[in-house]
């Protein structure tokens, strides 16, 4: 009996006609969750990310929502989210595949 695969990452990349440009991503529902996030309070976004179980991919698997809760929003300084796609581990190409095949995801 085959196990059905449910992709969360690279979800559409094998579909005919899918490309890595932004228009194609939007056509497949991309950025809908971002629109939702713009209507939410920062603490609610952090809580949703925490409840989702999303973890860092740096080896320690630290909960992303917990890390986001550590940000000092009262400082008045800008807050930036940075994507680190450096692959320092020999033989791993996960970040490269995501950035090349579905960069907007």
Q: Where are these predicted regions, by residue range?
A:
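Feature of Fe-S/electron-transfer and energy-metabolism proteins
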Residues: 1-105
